[in-house]
């Protein structure tokens, strides 16, 4: 009986120490977990390129890589003491290792929050890391459509100028018709002008002769 009574306080003491140990561990995790969770590594990569997320894990531990969508984590890679296992996540292409993963052929949908969790041999959590990945879109390339637009604009300008010239040319027959030279060549126009000049000259001669004749008649009457 005495031995039972003596062992009872020892058991209680051990239990209390265990409770205090667990309490202190939870208290430390509660105090420092927000700091750890908010320690984010910012990484960026070009669309269509590759990006590597690097951790400080050693190769002799297990590592769990996952993607965080805001509500839940999705396992994408589990590296267990030298044995890599890649779990596809929406067609995610990557290489897996304890201290890093490489994501290939990045798309805009790959942007987001990623996490890495390292485990010791005993299975306890060793460290925890957050990554914020940003995939930069490709720069817009100049398409041939812009050149086509320029050509169309230039063609339009040339067409307008050509239409003006055509309009001026179309007015020429009307002006020539008003002057009496419709559908005539330059040689015909010169001949026509010469004939008009001869007719005018003959009319002037007739007028002069008639005036001279009238003057003679008036003198004979006197």
Swiss-Prot record:
Q: Which residues are glycosylated?
A: 50, 56, 60, 71, 105, 109, 125, 132, 147, 164, 168, 189
Transmembrane stretches in the record are: 193-213
What gene name is given for the protein in this entry? UL7
Protein name from the UniProt record: CEACAM1-like protein UL7
Q: Which GO terms describe its cellular component?
A: extracellular region; host cell plasma membrane; membrane
User: Principal localization?
Assistant: secreted
* Annotated source species: Human cytomegalovirus (strain Merlin) (HHV-5)
Which subcellular locations apply to this protein? Secreted; Host cell membrane
State the function annotated in the UniProt record. Plays a role in modulating the host immune response and affecting host cytokine production. Structurally and functionally homolog of host CEACAM1, induces endothelial cell angiogenesis.
Ranges in coiled-coil conformation: none
User: Its topology with respect to the membrane?
Assistant: Single-pass membrane protein
Highest taxon, organism lineage: Viruses
Q: Sorted alphabetically, which keywords does the UniProt record give? A: Glycoprotein, Host cell membrane, Host membrane, Host-virus interaction, Membrane, Modulation of host dendritic cell activity by virus, Secreted, Transmembrane, Transmembrane helix, Viral immunoevasion
Family that this chain belongs to: Belongs to the RL11 family.
GO biological process, any: symbiont-mediated activation of host signal transduction pathway via agonism of host cell surface receptor
Q: How is it modified after translation?
A: Highly glycosylated.
């Amino acid at each position: 009986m005495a031995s039972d009574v003596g062992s009872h306080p020892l058991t209680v003491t051990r239990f209390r120490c265990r409770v205090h140990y667990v309490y202190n561990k939870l208290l430390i995790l509660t105090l420092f977990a927000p700091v750890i969770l908010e320690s984010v590594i910012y990484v960026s990569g070009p669309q269509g390129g590759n990006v590597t997320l690097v951790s400080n894990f050693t190769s002799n531990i297990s590592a769990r890589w996952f993607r965080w969508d805001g509500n839940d984590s999705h396992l994408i890679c589990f590296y267990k003491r030298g044995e890599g296992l890649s779990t596809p996540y929406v067609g995610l292409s990557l290489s897996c290792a304890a201290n890093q993963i490489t994501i290939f052929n990045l798309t805009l949908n790959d942007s987001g929050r990623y996490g890495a969790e390292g485990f010791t041999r005993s299975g306890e959590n060793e460290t925890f890391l957050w990554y914020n990945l940003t995939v930069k879109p490709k720069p817009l390339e100049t398409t041939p459509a812009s050149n086509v637009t320029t050509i169309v604009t230039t063609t339009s300008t040339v067409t307008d100028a050509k239409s003006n010239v055509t309009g001026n040319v179309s007015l020429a027959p009307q002006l020539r018709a008003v002057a009496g030279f419709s559908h005539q060549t330059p040689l015909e126009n010169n001949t026509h002008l010469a004939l008009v000049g001869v007719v005018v000259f003959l009319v002037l001669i007739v007028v002069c002769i008639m005036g001279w004749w009238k003057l003679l008649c008036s003198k004979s009457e006197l």
